[in-house]
């Protein structure tokens, strides 16, 4: 639907002063949502949410991606804090960081 300039102005104007979110809040939200900005990372998070923990090899078996690609996605999730890992000899066990997930949910709720 094409609007006239007058209609567009009427639609987009408000008498209320909008408050911008705190910079730290916005940066936190951007960082955590960026970690979920790829479908493979969303699938990894979903997989880890449904399991208590998961070895890297088990994650690779569930994903239609090369092991190196899965490792890169896990690295991003770990760097943003959504995922934690524990090294057990030659194996790496991954799990969801429940505090970070709760923080993400709280940030989204504040939108």
Please provide the spans of the model-predicted regions.
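Alpha-helical residues within the helix-turn-helix
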Residues: 61, 72, 78-79
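Beta-hairpin "wing" of winged helix-turn-helix
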Residues: 78-88, 95
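N-terminal helix-turn-helix DNA-binding core of bacterial DNA-binding proteins
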Residues: 27-68, 92-99
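N-terminal leader segment of winged-helix/HTH proteins
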Residues: 1-36, 82, 107-108
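A cross-family signal for key residues in well-ordered alpha-helices
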Residues: 46, 78, 105
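Short, structured secondary-structure boundary patches
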Residues: 65, 90-92, 106-110
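Short, charged/polar, Gly/Pro-enriched secondary-structure boundary elements
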Residues: 99-105
């Amino acid at each position: 639907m094409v609007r006239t300039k007058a209609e567009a102005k009427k639609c987009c104007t408000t008498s209320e002063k909008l408050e911008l979110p705190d910079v730290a809040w916005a940066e936190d939200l951007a960082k955590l949502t960026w970690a979920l900005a790829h479908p493979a990372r969303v699938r990894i998070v979903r997989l880890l949410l449904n399991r208590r923990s998961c070895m890297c090899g088990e994650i690779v078996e569930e994903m239609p991606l090369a092991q190196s690609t899965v490792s890169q996605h896990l690295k991003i999730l770990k760097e943003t804090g959504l995922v934690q890992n524990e090294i057990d000899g030659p194996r790496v066990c991954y799990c969801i960081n429940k505090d970070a997930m709760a923080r993400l949910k709280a940030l989204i709720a504040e939108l």
